[in-house]
Amino acid sequence: MLNSVKKLLGDSQKRKIKNYEQIVNDINQLESVMETLSDDELRQKTVAFQHMLQNGKTVEDIKVEAFAVVREAAKRVLGLRHYDVQLIGGLVLLEGNIAEMPTGEGKTLVSSLPTYVRALEKKGVHVITVNDYLAKRDKELIGRVHEFLGLTVGLNMSQMESIDKKRAYEADITYGIGTEFGFDYLRDNMASSKAEQVQRPFHFAIIDEIDSVLIDEAKTPLIIAGKKSSSSDFHHLCAKVMKTFQDTLHYTYDAETKACNFTEDGITKIEDLFDIDNLYDLEHQTLYHYMIQALRAHVAFQLDVDYIIEDEKIMLVDIFTGRIMDGRSLSDGLHQALEAKEGLPITDENQTQASITIQNFFRMYPALSGMTGTAKTEEKEFNRVYNMEVISIPTNRPILREDKKDVVYITADAKYKAVCAEVMNIHKKERPILIGTMSILQSETVARYLDEANLPYQLLNAKSAEQEADLIALAGKKGKITIATNMAGRGTDILLEKGVHELGGLHVIGTERHESRRVDNQLKGRAGRQGDPGSSQFFLSLEDEMIQRYAGEDVEKLKKSLKIDENGLILNNKIYDLINRTQLICEGSHFSMREYNLKLDDVINDQRNVVYKLRNNLLNEEVNMIEIVIPMIKNTLTVIAKDHLLEGMLPEEWDFTRLVEDLKAVLSTEEIPALSANNVHSAEDLQELLKDTLTSYIERVNALESDADAQQVLRQISLHFLDSGWTSHLSAMQHLKEGIGLRQYQQEDPARLYQKEGFEIFLHTFSHFEKEVALYLARYITVPQNI
């Protein structure tokens, strides 16, 4: 069997497969040995492995025997034996890479191997699934194997109590969805004591459907937000103004990146309407913020594609799955701008208190691996961003699905009529049909055409999400026609009814190319699972969104030379080159956007790491707070000197009165040496004059070292000022990000400017935090009983 692996995989992977082949042979040779062991003897292997690791052996040293142990345990507990290709998948994951395995090839069983080996290190292993149902299912299934071998297994779910979460994280292996692990990380970094934190340091994670998590959701930030009031009238006014703006004249919109900005004419119009001189003045920052969000709501978000309205509320739709993101809202006033656009009541605005992107969250794991059926097309990105390779694992059974050639029509109307004709033809044979669509809007369009053709169907989109499991279970029945958005793709199985195999299995129809070949492959993969028969075909048109967005001009040039039949079908083969090229351009554009956004997010990620490191230090009650605050006092004095002893001004022009007042406040004394242009010509002069005063004050501060109450007060107040400052800083960075795109017109690199100006904002935020702590300490020393 392993010889056939070499033929199935490309030359680039042959060396790796050779290595895996030898390791799998070694594992197989141990199978008969493991079969002779009693349950207790097999369980004792876990203890032996742990001792070996504690005494200097590595995971590499024990992996062969450990894999053999897990295989034997799975046979006894589940009645399932790992195939050779599943062992290869486990080895790929153990190395921190991606195992590409089609759905139905037993990825869940594969994950049992590396999770066991890495859990032996007693540092915790996280298994990430795409939803709570799968996390619970996999924990209960594979967890039985690991518990049989003496390991502990936990489940991390939303809405769990902190004590239960802590228990889940203390387990050797913890299952859950990625966003919940991310939110726990943010909550831990908002905790007011160490006891409230639930996570251990990150060690090793395996992500199921890794492409969905690390590619599709890469830009999605995890946000913990508080509420702040928002001006309902102002949002409605800006929405009303926006309706008078014209594309190109007043604003630009890049459909590829969904980036929008005001033109000079647009800026002038805003300034005239609101009777202001310069929109970019600091005093008009709020107006600019409301207007740019109104613009985004107006042009970048489409009803029944990006969101739906339910009970007078905006419900966001996940564009990757088609599911409603219940409880999620857009931040920084964009959600309110959408409400104003649709004439809905304005809700309170979310103010970000903590955030992190999926990308930067998972990059914190020292070792990361994953499984998916579709990752090879994104291998470059996985390698560049996460330093992971994609290894294609062959199927245990051959794939019988027939992927038919795409058909391309001149108009969308001709395409949908052809889809109806195809559905009618296949429906007569009683084969089940799944029609995949890009959005709610498109699924309802397809439904209208099927209604006109009197074809029965089930419609499955975000508006019918609660019926998803029931509807998808029926999709493999004889004569069943199912229209589905992307939501029907992952985490659900279409089981073929008895007799459907003989009819040819499930037929999948794609109604539009997705913006990634990977997502197209996911749709095709709904048919022909686990060796079932099946087929797929895409019906496209030159009016499809991807074609119009990325190749509109090319299409117009090409139209004159196209041969078209009476049904609107394009007969020229060169149209396929255009479509394939367009999809590659689209993929490249999205990759570039993710790369650009990662550059921007890396700036705030570095800042977050500094703040969270300090915060965890503050939470540590063994840390002496006096050792933390004394440098803050000295830094604050340096900043005060810099603020008052301004370069480019003569000492006679410096405001010594204000300087003395600020120094008195920080040093908690009225006895500041006389300061004037006569004795202060530089910061060094000031430092020398304040030497004795500062020494005396530091002695008073050091006296608090043995005062437990003072230590606790300083700890809590420092946390308060740090959290408050960080919340304000996140808002400032968001506003900087909003305006940074405009700098392109000034021939400046936006990413570099964001880094430079973001660093300046961060320095200001940090200085302000240190000054607040220093001032509080000065007041506390003076009158501690009143603070």
From Swiss-Prot:
Record PROSITE patterns: SECA, SECA_MOTOR_DEAD
Documented EC number(s): 7.4.2.8
Location of the protein in the cell: Cell membrane; Cytoplasm
Cross-referenced InterPro entries: Helicase_ATP-bd (IPR014001), Helicase_C-like (IPR001650), P-loop_NTPase (IPR027417), SecA (IPR000185), SecA2_Bac_anthr (IPR030908), SecA_CS (IPR020937), SecA_DEAD (IPR011115), SecA_motor_DEAD (IPR014018)
Gene3D superfamilies with a match to the protein in the record: Helical scaffold and wing domains of SecA (1.10.3060.10), P-loop containing nucleotide triphosphate hydrolases (3.40.50.300), SecA, preprotein cross-linking domain (3.90.1440.10)
SMART domains: SecA_DEAD (SM00957), SecA_PP_bind (SM00958)
Cell membrane as UniProt keyword: yes
Entry similarity comment: Belongs to the SecA family.
Its biological purpose: Part of the Sec protein translocase complex. Interacts with the SecYEG preprotein conducting channel. Has a central role in coupling the hydrolysis of ATP to the transfer of proteins into and across the cell membrane, serving as an ATP-driven molecular motor driving the stepwise translocation of polypeptide chains across the membrane.
Protein name: Protein translocase subunit SecA 2
Origin species: Bacillus thuringiensis subsp. konkukian (strain 97-27)
Annotated gene: secA2
